[in-house]
């Protein structure tokens, strides 16, 4: 399992990952195991007390590690955020927006959703901190929504490594309506192509009739 504990704030986390994806985490407030997919909990089990004990051990060791480092604070890295839909966007069809925040260190961050500049809390879910190979972290925040051409969305990221909150904007890309001039040009091109096809077809028919007439054997006198 992955244990994270830091101060100030007494912030801790215990998670298990498989192939880069979160398998389960221990809810520290409810003191229970939360599976990412309910089916996992039917196949196996994990005693949340094991996770709580690991966090307590991390808390105990943190003081010694801090002294060994001569109380040198960790370097705050600036996280990077990207927003994208889970599925191709169709107006009026339920979908999910994903805010992927990478290069998080230390693992303390606030991720919030805004719709038309107003905070949104319904339909929001986020993962625990997931570990990268360079020992930084990443996290995903999800927002279920129904796309509308009247709504715009922002993923707001706040972190110690940022001078100010970062907003990652997203809105549905709706094709611009075709102008009357464009429609006229398209119709004219279609008509021209059709006329050319008729003329070429007529020429081929005439040539075919002529070649057929010259090759016909003469009849009896």
UniProtKB/Swiss-Prot annotation:
Domain Ig-like C1-type: 79-171
Region Alpha-2: start-end pairs: 77-170
SUPFAM superfamilies according to UniProt: Immunoglobulin (SSF48726), MHC antigen-recognition domain (SSF54452)
CDD domains cross-referenced by the UniProt entry: IgC1_MHC_II_alpha_I-A
GO molecular function, a single term: peptide antigen binding
Transmembrane segments: 184-209
Cysteines joined through disulfide linkages: 99-155
Topology relative to the membrane: Single-pass type I membrane protein
Cytoplasmic side: 210-221
Protein localization: Membrane
GO biological process terms, semicolon-separated: adaptive immune response; antigen processing and presentation; antigen processing and presentation of exogenous peptide antigen via MHC class II; antigen processing and presentation of peptide antigen; positive regulation of T cell differentiation
Keywords, in A-Z order: Adaptive immunity, Disulfide bond, Glycoprotein, Immunity, Membrane, MHC II, Transmembrane, Transmembrane helix
InterPro entries: Ig-like_dom, Ig-like_dom_sf, Ig-like_fold, Ig/MHC_CS, Ig_C1-set, MHC/Immunoglobulin, MHC_I/II-like_Ag-recog, MHC_II_a/b_N
Main location: membrane
Keyword match Transcription: no
Family: Belongs to the MHC class II family.
This protein's name: H-2 class II histocompatibility antigen, A-Q alpha chain
């Amino acid at each position: 399992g992955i244990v994270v504990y830091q101060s100030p704030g007494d912030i801790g986390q215990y998670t298990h990952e498989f192939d880069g994806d979160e398998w389960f985490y221990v809810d520290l407030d409810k003191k229970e195991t939360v599976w990412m997919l309910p089916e996992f909990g039917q196949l196996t089990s994990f005693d949340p007390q094991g996770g709580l004990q690991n966090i307590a051990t991390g808390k105990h060791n943190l003081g010694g590690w801090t002294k060994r480092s001569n109380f040198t604070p960790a370097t705050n890295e600036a996280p990077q955020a990207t927003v994208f839909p889970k599925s191709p966007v169709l107006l009026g069809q339920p979908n999910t927006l994903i805010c992927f925040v990478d290069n998080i260190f230390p693992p303390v961050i606030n991720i919030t959703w805004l719709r038309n500049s107003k905070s949104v809390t319904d339909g929001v879910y986020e993962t625990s901190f997931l570990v990268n190979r360079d020992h930084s972290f990443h996290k995903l925040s999800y927002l279920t929504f129904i796309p509308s051409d009247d709504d715009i969305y922002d993923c707001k990221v706040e972190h110690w490594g940022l001078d100010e909150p970062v907003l990652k904007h997203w809105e549905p890309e709706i094709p611009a309506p075709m102008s009357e001039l464009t429609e006229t040009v398209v119709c004219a091109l279609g008509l021209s192509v059709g006329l050319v096809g008729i003329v070429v077809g007529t020429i081929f028919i005439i040539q075919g009739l002529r070649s057929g007439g010259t090759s016909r054997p003469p009849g009896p006198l």
